[in-house]
């Protein structure tokens, strides 16, 4: 039996002290609704981390590649001896087979960790092999935390992944929708080609990619 490692959720009360240690209230600091606010503590954005030329080259290649829908276990059809999967209604996106270009994706993530994450979060022991997601019209990724999930019986989160930092690199130019929303932090990010977006993977940083209304978006994930 696997032991669950439970994590107490942050209070998310705007009238209580912020998690960042600034001494300010949460609602006046990392969850501020001000239009001139900075990104919350734990979010790092580097514009043009990847050149537009590299973005276009990877998108041209990805457009020709096969892709598979993200799946989830179908508990109604699965048996102890056979696991059956189905399309996940909350994750309407495809993982692209990058084949010979996978080494380029690995190098981008490695550089992000060495040049950016090491200064902001500390040195990484390892990184997950990155994969490329393709979102088309109607595509979305529902609310979730990357490394934790919620146990309603205990009113606590528990770890499901050995991930401390999430890394996204956006490649696409012509799309509408798909903004990245952090619910508890009241923070919205509009992706742009070449941008590196990093954030802490725990429950405070629960997020969702909203539905796309036009075009195709590619996002490199690790």
Range-by-range predicted roles:
Residues 18-20, 29-30, 55:
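Disulfide-bonded cysteines in secreted/extracellular proteins and peptides
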Residues 25-33:
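Cysteine-rich micro-motifs
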Residues 8-24:
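Short Cys/His-rich zinc-binding micro-motifs
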Residues 1-11, 32-198, 204-222:
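Fe(II)/2-oxoglutarate oxygenase catalytic core
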């Amino acid at each position: 039996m696997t032991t669950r490692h439970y994590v107490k959720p942050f209070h998310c009360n705007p009238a209580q002290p912020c998690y960042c240690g600034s001494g300010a209230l949460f609602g006046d600091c990392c969850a501020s609704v001000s239009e001139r606010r900075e990104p919350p503590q734990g979010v790092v954005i580097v514009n043009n981390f990847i050149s537009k030329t590299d973005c276009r080259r990877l998108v041209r290649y990805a457009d020709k590649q096969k892709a598979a829908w993200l799946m989830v276990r179908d508990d109604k059809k699965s048996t102890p001896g056979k696991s059956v999967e189905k399309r996940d209604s909350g994750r309407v996106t495809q993982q692209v087979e990058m084949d010979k270009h996978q080494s380029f994706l690995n190098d981008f993530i490695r550089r992000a960790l060495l040049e950016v994450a090491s200064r902001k979060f500390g040195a990484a022991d390892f990184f997950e092999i990155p994969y490329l997601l393709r979102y088309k019209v109607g595509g979305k990724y529902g609310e979730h935390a990357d490394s934790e999930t919620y146990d309603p019986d205990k009113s606590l989160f528990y770890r499901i992944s050995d991930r401390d930092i999430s890394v996204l690199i956006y490649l696409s130019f012509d799309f509408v929708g798909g903004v990245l929303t952090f619910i508890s932090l009241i923070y919205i990010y509009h992706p742009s080609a070449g941008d590196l977006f990093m954030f802490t993977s725990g429950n405070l940083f629960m997020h969702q990619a909203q539905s796309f209304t036009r075009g195709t978006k590619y996002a490199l994930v690790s």
